[in-house]
């Protein structure tokens, strides 16, 4: 069985929040893997051992297949992060659209923008927003200063560009690969070089990769510092530790041809991704309110943009599973002035999904 309506490893039903904040046992992720792409003509080679050319480990995860070039995509984000503070929009657009580091064996370049404009991906973001390319639409508008970003300062647009690329697109790419792995597993395609485990490996390559300080892995560590949820080393988020463990479990399940084990691991992986971006949603909403109390409306607008960019990563988890996202959207959406609602209003929307995933107070922490 593949993942259902909204993400890897979900079961039937939806996580609709009731007044008591309970959640039914189902919801799950940012994706829709119900479209389990058939792997017609693909290999059904029995699972086994890593390939001879398997990429060396990254961050404690031993790849089973070759993702030498996939793990370099995050280096493009390093290049973007180096210049985004100087608002070099045209240079960023060039890196985004044409890529730099992830050169494939045929000489073509794997690009962040190329993924963002791709239609029919298994991340569910398009399903939720009802448009074919919502990831690219968001980033391109921020780069060009159009749509909701028209008339906004460079500092505000920076949040849409940087968080849109580093987090929205990269997490959607991770989720797409997890769901692609589940779809191949459902088809019995456990070929190590090109089947389910290869997509699973790609998910870690896009999340951590060759430069973990530039991608989602780094965001998780920052939010853990904010919320008091760093691991025993004082540097790594509990969410990153949990995600790594889930990725290892899923890899091993796929090598063993264990589809059910992979579904369970994908659900656990989604839990830890959710923690990071739920934390980010709360943090930047709180900063908006404190900015306004201090009379700093420009800072409030910047933090609203940052919070909105982060919230859009988990919004499909909520919305695709029957939870009303309008309260948080009204607080963070850039179409609205900052300052409505409260952190408590946001927490009330998130609580049912926190309960569904079994996220403990120690795992989620607290801000401030």
Task: Describe the predicted segments one by one.
Residues 1-47:
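Ser/Thr-rich, Pro/Gly/Ala-heavy low-complexity intrinsically disordered linkers and tails
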Residues 46-368:
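Mature extracytoplasmic or organellar-lumen-exposed domains after removal of signal/transit peptides
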């Amino acid at each position: 069985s593949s993942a259902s309506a909204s993400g890897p490893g979900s079961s039937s039903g939806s996580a609709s929040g009731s007044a008591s904040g309970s959640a039914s046992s189902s919801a799950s992720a940012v994706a829709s893997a119900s479209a389990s792409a058939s792997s017609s003509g693909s290999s059904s080679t029995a699972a086994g051992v890593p390939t001879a050319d398997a990429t060396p480990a990254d961050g404690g995860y031993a790849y089973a297949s070759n993702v030498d070039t996939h793990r370099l995509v995050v280096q493009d984000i390093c290049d973007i992060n180096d210049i985004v503070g100087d608002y070099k929009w045209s240079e960023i657009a060039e890196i985004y659209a044409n890529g730099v580091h992830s050169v494939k064996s045929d000489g073509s370049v794997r690009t962040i923008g190329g993924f963002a404009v791709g239609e029919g991906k298994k991340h569910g973001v398009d399903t939720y927003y009802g448009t074919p390319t919502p990831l690219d639409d968001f980033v391109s508008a921020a780069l060009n200063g159009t749509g909701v970003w028209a008339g906004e300062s460079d500092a505000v647009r920076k949040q849409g560009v940087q968080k849109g690329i580093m987090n929205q697109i990269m997490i959607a790419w991770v989720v797409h690969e997890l769901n692609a792995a589940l779809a191949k597993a459902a088809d019995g395609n456990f070929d190590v070089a090109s089947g389910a485990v290869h997509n699973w490996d790609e998910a870690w390559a896009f999340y951590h990769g060759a430069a973990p300080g530039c991608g989602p892995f780094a965001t998780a560590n920052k939010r853990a510092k904010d919320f008091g949820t760093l691991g025993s080393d004082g540097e790594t988020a509990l969410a990153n530790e949990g995600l790594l463990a889930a990725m290892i479990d899923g890899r091993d399940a796929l090598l063993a041809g264990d589809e059910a084990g992979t579904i369970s691991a994908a659900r656990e992986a989604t839990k830890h991704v959710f923690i990071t971006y739920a934390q980010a949603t709360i943090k930047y909403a709180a900063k908006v309110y404190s900015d306004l109390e201090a009379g700093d409306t420009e800072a409030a607008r910047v933090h609203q943009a940052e919070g909105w960019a982060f919230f859009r990563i988990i919004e499909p988890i909520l919305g695709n599973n029957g939870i009303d996202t309008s309260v948080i959207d009204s607080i963070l959406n850039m179409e609205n002035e900052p300052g409505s609602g409260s952190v408590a209003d946001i927490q009330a929307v998130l609580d049912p999904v926190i309960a569904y995933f079994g996220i403990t107070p120690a795992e989620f922490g607290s801000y401030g």
